C-alpha cells in the first residue's frame, strides 16, 4: 500500500509553478466624468484600497474639479462653459468633451482597461461619457461604463 501512495503522489514541475514575480499587470484607469463621476473617483481614491489604478477626473465645472482628489484632472469645455458646468445640458457636455478630445486621448494612452463612471442626471456625465468611452476604445482599451 505504501508503494502505491508514492506512485499516486503528484508534484508540480518548475514549469507548472505560478510565477509570483510576473511583470505582467494591466494598466487600469478609472475616469470620473461630471460631478457624480468625480465624486465616485474621489471616494475610491480616498478609500486607499485600490492600488495600481490611475484615477482621472473630467469635468466642465472648474470649482467642482478642484475639490476632486484625483491626481490627473482634465477641465473640459473652457471656451464653451467658462468653467460653470453645462446646466444639465448633455449636448453641451458632448461638445465640451469633443473640444478636449486630444487631451483625453493622450491621457488614456497606454491603458489596457478603462472604467468610465458618471451620474447620468447632469449634462457633463450624460453628454461627455460616450465621447470618453469612444476615446478609450480608440486607444485600444477595454472600456466599461458604470
Where are these regions (language model features)?
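Tubulin/FtsZ superfamily GTPase core signature
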Residues: 1-146
Amino acid at each position: 500500500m505504501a508503494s502505491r501512495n508514492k506512485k499516486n503522489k503528484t508534484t508540480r514541475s518548475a514549469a507548472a509553478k505560478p510565477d509570483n514575480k510576473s511583470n505582467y499587470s494591466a494598466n487600469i484607469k478609472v475616469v470620473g466624468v461630471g460631478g457624480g463621476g468625480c465624486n465616485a473617483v474621489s471616494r475610491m481614491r480616498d478609500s486607499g484600497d485600490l492600488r495600481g489604478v490611475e484615477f482621472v477626473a473630467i469635468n466642465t465645472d472648474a470649482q467642482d474639479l478642484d475639490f476632486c482628489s484625483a491626481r490627473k484632472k482634465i477641465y473640459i469645455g473652457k471656451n464653451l462653459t467658462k468653467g460653470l458646468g453645462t446646466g444639465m445640458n448633455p449636448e453641451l457636455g458632448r461638445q465640451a468633451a469633443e473640444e478636449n478630445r486630444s487631451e483625453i486621448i493622450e491621457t488614456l494612452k497606454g491603458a489596457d482597461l478603462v472604467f468610465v463612471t458618471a451620474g447620468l442626471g447632469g449634462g457633463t456625465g450624460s453628454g461627455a461619457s460616450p465621447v470618453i468611452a469612444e476615446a478609450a476604445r480608440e486607444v485600444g482599451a477595454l472600456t466599461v461604463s458604470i
